[in-house]
């Protein structure tokens, strides 16, 4: 999977906590942040208008479904 670079501004406290976690888990900060973002996106639901039986209704869908619908 291709990776892109993202720049974040974090508080000193967040960096300290991230560094402690990095040392404890023996993985890079990037790996921890990537995992956190992926978990966050998995939990998110987005309301999308979908046609069902000739009428529109709101339906919550996950990120993957939203991206799939956007491509169609």
Curated annotation (Swiss-Prot):
Region (Disordered): 52-72
GO terms (BP aspect): regulation of DNA-templated transcription
An example Gene Ontology molecular-function term: sequence-specific DNA binding
Name of the protein in question: Uncharacterized protein YiiE
Pfam families with a match to the protein in the record: RHH_1 (PF01402)
Composition bias, Basic and acidic residues: 55-72
Family in the record: Belongs to the YiiE family.
Disulfide bonds: none
């Amino acid at each position: 999977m291709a990776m892109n670079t993202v720049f974040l501004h974090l508080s000193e406290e967040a960096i300290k906590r991230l560094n402690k976690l990095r040392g404890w888990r023996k993985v890079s900060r990037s790996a921890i942040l990537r995992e956190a973002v992926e978990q966050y996106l998995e939990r998110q639901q987005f309301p999308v208008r979908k046609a069902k039986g000739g009428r529109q209704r709101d339906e919550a869908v996950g990120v993957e479904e939203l991206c799939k619908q956007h491509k169609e």
